[in-house]
Amino acid sequence: MLTLTIKKKWFDMILSGEKKEEYRDCKPYYQKRFCPYFGREVVDGKKVRQVFPVRLRNGYDVRSPSIIAKCTVRRGTGKPEWGAEPGKEYYVLDIIEMGSEK
């Protein structure tokens, strides 16, 4: 399962249901991480409609709080109130459904 670490502010907003997207820079590092799960389409800029579970972890320790979210991914811009820089392109993980919490 793909695991992404996020800051507490964003983790809490996602957990409360307020934040519905998570952003990652469009860089080779994330291309390599996303392709095995979402396929080549995400690199080519197409929205991947297939839903995949992603573990969002608040910290690097395996015991850190985490949630499993069902997500789709696309390339696009994000919302500044959710941490995105205006006009910058990101891999946008759209959170479709919240799963279990650890």
Region spans (language model):
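Structured alpha/beta reader/binder surfaces that contact nucleic acids or chromatin modification marks
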Residues: 4-102
